[in-house]
């Protein structure tokens, strides 16, 4: 199972946002929607052995207590179409569910809980995508779990949490998070490994 975790630094954690204003009013939710689509879509199919976690920090002036994690499972997801609005609608629907400490089913293939990066790191051995990391094209083996940031850099607090994790790079230039996910999946495909 391949896993991608994307931190949405300004992403709202409530369903009261407009699908017509995901870049602004939803805190760059459009970036996260593209990451969902990149994680799962093939031509005429979905990657069933992939999960994507969105860590929604709650908006501009967010209280850390309002951070939620959404888990999307390729094995069970339904009603996902290859456009941002479709992914945004699923996120909005999932956020209607009141998050608790453990994952709750919010929709087919989507779960929600009240937690952030620290708890996710306790559960899975993640690697960090960083332009100064080991190149995925030359790495002997690749991890199955990757952490990315949205359009912003990791915060100091996040850097402290991930400082000892292995770091990998998709190349010498900084790319959009969704493009990075596609390149990683392509590398797994080229190696004939899962995903």
Swiss-Prot record:
Compartments, record wording: Cytoplasm
EC number: 2.1.1.257
GO CC, any one term: cytoplasm
Top-level taxon: Archaea
InterPro entries: Alpha/beta_knot_MTases (IPR029028), TrmY (IPR007158), tRNA_m1G_MTases_N (IPR029026)
GO molecular function: S-adenosylmethionine-dependent methyltransferase activity; tRNA methyltransferase activity
Single GO BP term: tRNA methylation
Keywords: Cytoplasm, Methyltransferase, S-adenosyl-L-methionine, Transferase, tRNA processing
Broad class of enzyme this protein falls into: transferase
Family annotation (Pfam families): Methyltrn_RNA_2
Binding site residues for S-adenosyl-L-methionine: 129
Predominant location: cytoplasm
Catalytic activities: pseudouridine(54) in tRNA + S-adenosyl-L-methionine = N(1)-methylpseudouridine(54) in tRNA + S-adenosyl-L-homocysteine + H(+)
Family that this chain belongs to: Belongs to the methyltransferase superfamily. TrmY family.
PANTHER family named among the record's database cross-references: TRNA (PSEUDOURIDINE(54)-N(1))-METHYLTRANSFERASE
Function: Specifically catalyzes the N1-methylation of pseudouridine at position 54 (Psi54) in tRNAs.
UniProt subunit comment: Homodimer.
Name assigned to this protein: tRNA (pseudouridine(54)-N(1))-methyltransferase
Organism: Methanocorpusculum labreanum (strain ATCC 43576 / DSM 4855 / Z)
């Amino acid at each position: 199972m391949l896993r991608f975790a994307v931190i949405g630094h300004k992403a709202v954690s409530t369903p009261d946002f407009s699908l017509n204003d995901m870049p602004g009013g939803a805190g760059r939710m459009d970036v996260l929607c593209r990451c969902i689509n990149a994680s799962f879509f093939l031509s005429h199919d979905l990657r069933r052995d992939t999960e994507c976690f969105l860590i929604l920090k709650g908006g501009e002036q967010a209280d850390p207590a309002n951070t939620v994690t959404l888990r999307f499972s390729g094995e069970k997801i339904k009603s996902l179409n290859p456009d941002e609005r479709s992914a945004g609608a699923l996120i909005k629907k999932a956020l209607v569910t009141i998050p608790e400490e453990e994952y709750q089913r919010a929709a087919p293939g989507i779960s929600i809980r009240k937690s952030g990066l620290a708890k996710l790191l306790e559960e899975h051995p993640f690697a960090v995508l960083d332009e100064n990391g080991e190149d995925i094209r030359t790495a002997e083996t690749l991890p199955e779990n990757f952490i990315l940031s949205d359009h912003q850099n990791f915060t100091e607090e996040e850097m402290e949490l991930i400082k000892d994790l292995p770091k990998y790079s998709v190349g010498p230039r900084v790319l959009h998070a969704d493009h990075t996910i596609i390149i990683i999946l392509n590398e797994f495909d080229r190696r004939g490994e899962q995903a």
